[in-house]
Design a protein with these regions (language model features):
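Metal-dependent amide/peptide-bond hydrolase catalytic core
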Residues: 1-11, 210-302
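Acidic/His- and Gly-rich active-site-bordering loop/insert found
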Residues: 2-132
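Generic secondary-structure signature for well-ordered alpha-helical cores
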Residues: 21, 25-28, 32, 36-39, ...
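Conserved active-site and cofactor/substrate-binding residues in soluble primary-metabolism enzymes
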Residues: 22-25, 42, 46, 50, ...
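Conserved short loop/turn motifs at secondary-structure junctions
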Residues: 39-40, 134-138, 289-293
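Solvent-exposed beta-strand sheet faces enriched in polar/charged residues
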Residues: 65, 89, 134, 232, ...
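Histidine/acidic-residue-rich, glycine-tolerant segments that coordinate divalent metal ions
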Residues: 71-77, 93-101, 105-106, 122-244
């Protein structure tokens, strides 16, 4: 297709870019505003409201609380009839204790600008199809998109687009990049607090957590090239003269495939159960839905 309604595709692209340029000041303000008030996963109430307010000011109706997630949203612009459905995905959660170190304020703003610009010109073009923007909370842990997928949040979407900031200028631009599968585990141990002068009267939950980390390190020679397991201890006591009665650790797991994530998770769960047996601390394990590996569609990328 080289023309639409007698106008070249390049000219339509120019119109879309001109609309984006018109929105530039508002988009920059939106990005800075989200950046200035970072919110962690599923708590992005201000951020999602700011994006919806921007979209509504551009004349779009928004569905807040999409997929029964309070900080998710959706807006839609339909064409002249049934056709391809493209969705721009917006992320806007921040890293705990860091803020927007991964630039989700930029992701949200780019998605908002791309949707608003394309949707407006899309109507002028008079073609069939649909343009959507979908607000996806809790990317930095919480598996927001996986939950939305299970609830039908992406039903009917033919292809989805998202941008992610990086460093290095144009030499680091990636259009058709693959992505590894990922998952996470939260492992908690409940023991028995005691005074450090009488450790035998307690059950050290921190020792159990440390045992899990040590066992994982022993298993690393068995890891495949793209396997990655990183963990942190979130809770492990509050005073050095008290045997910790509770510990909580979180593990981020990446691998080439969902199948391998499942295998790695089972290995770590085995470590946790052995630590429970060794120390006597009771273990509780929580997992999030696994993100599948990503395969880009080259024709769409082009």
């Amino acid at each position: 297709m080289t023309e639409i309604k007698g106008i070249s595709v390049d000219e339509w692209k120019k119109k879309i870019c001109e609309e984006a340029e018109r929105l530039r000041p508002q988009l920059i303000q939106l990005s800075h505003s989200i950046h200035d008030e970072p919110e962690i996963g599923f708590q992005e109430f201000k951020s999602s409201a700011k994006i919806c307010d921007f979209l509504e000011k551009q004349g779009f109706e928004t569905e807040r609380g999409y997929c029964d997630l309070p900080t998710s949203f959706k807006a839609v612009k339909k064409g002249t009839g049934k056709g391809p459905v493209v969705a721009f995905l917006a992320e806007y959660d921040a890293l705990r204790g860091v803020g927007h170190g991964c630039g989700h304020n930029v992701i949200a703003t780019c998605a908002s600008g791309a949707f608003a610009s394309l949707a407006k010109i899309f109507v002028e073009m008079g073609i069939a199809g649909e343009v959507r923007i979908i607000g996806t909370p809790a990317e930095e842990g919480g598996a927001g998109k996986a939950i939305m997928l299970e609830r039908g949040g992406f039903d009917g979407v033919d292809f989805a687009l998202m941008i992610h900031p990086t460093c290095g200028g144009e030499s680091r631009n990636y259009i058709n990049r693959n992505g590894r599968a990922s998952g996470s585990l939260t492992i908690s141990f409940t023991g028995q607090s005691a005074h450090s002068s009488a450790p035998a009267t307690g059950i050290n939950a921190l020792t159990a957590a440390i045992s899990v980390f040590n066992q994982i390190d022993m298993l690393r020679p068995l890891f495949e090239t793209e396997d990655n397991v990183n963990g942190v201890i979130l809770e492990g006591g509050t005073a050095s003269n008290v045997i910790p009665g509770f510990s909580k650790s979180e593990f981020c797991i990446r691998a080439a495939t969902m199948k391998r994530i499942d295998e790695l998770q089972n290995m770590i769960i085995g470590c946790a159960k052995r630590a429970e047996s060794l120390t006597g601390a009771k273990v509780q394990i929580q997992s999030e839905p696994i993100y599948a590996e990503r395969y880009p569609c080259l024709p769409i990328c082009e």
